[in-house]
Swiss-Prot record:
Organism: Mus musculus
Listed name of the protein: X-linked lymphocyte-regulated protein 5C
Tissue specificity of this protein: Expressed in testis (at protein level). Also expressed in ovary. Not detected in other tissues tested.
Family recorded in the similarity comment: Belongs to the XLR/SYCP3 family.
Gene encoding the protein: Xlr5c
Biased composition (Low complexity): 42-53
Biased composition (Basic and acidic residues): 1-11, 56-75
Spans annotated as Disordered: 1-75
S-S bonds: none
Keyword 4Fe-4S among UniProt keywords: no
Source taxon at top rank: Eukaryota
Length: 179
């Protein structure tokens, strides 16, 4: 790495990146700790109260599970989980559908009850309104007929009055001529 690159790295506060192809220190160091070689907790020198057979019995279920898992690559477990998931989803949809159906029925029943209540309360009011409208229409026709009759009577009275005025005027004219 050049001097300039080193200065840039110091200024930016970043650490130098190690290239992937370079061997790590573990390969150079022969004493590197391999987790598979040494257990995290050493039981040999600690004076364990359990015997070796107890330890072996404790490891057997874990090893058996590991072999089962490695044996079928987890596809059986995944298929079981997938099947369970599908069943859960289908059950959720069924319960959701049932809930929606019950809500829909409840709303329909509520609407039907409101409609019957409305018809009960306002049906008679509507019927009375129709009767009043018919009565009003009949009265309108009657008053229209009476108004026409009164107009005819007034028209004849006006004509009679005009004739009487004309006759009175003619009499006055003849009387004035005579006198």
């Amino acid at each position: 790495m050049s001097n300039k690159e080193q200065k840039d790295m110091k200024k930016s506060g970043k650490h130098q990146r190690v290239h992937k192809t370079l061997p790590s220190d573990d390969f150079k160091n022969s004493d590197a700790v391999n987790p598979a070689d040494k257990p995290a907790v050493g039981t040999s020198g600690m004076g364990s109260h359990s015997s070796g057979s107890d330890m072996q019995e404790a490891r057997e279920p874990v090893q058996k599970k590991m072999q089962d898992f490695k044996g079928d690559d987890g596809t059986g477990l995944l298929m079981e989980k997938r099947k369970q998931f599908e069943e859960d989803v289908n059950a959720s949809f069924r319960s959701l559908n049932e809930n929606l159906q019950s809500i829909l029925k409840a709303q329909q029943n509520s609407r039907q009850e409101l409609k019957s209540l409305y018809c009960e309360r306002f049906g008679s009011v509507y019927h009375n309104w129709l009767v009043e409208m018919d009565r009003t229409r009949d009265q309108e026709e009657y008053f229209s007929f009476i108004t026409q009759q009164q107009m005819k009577i007034l028209q004849t009275a006006i004509e009679d009055h005009e004739t009487k005025l004309k006759n009175a005027k003619d009499m006055c004219d003849t009387f004035l001529k005579v006198w």
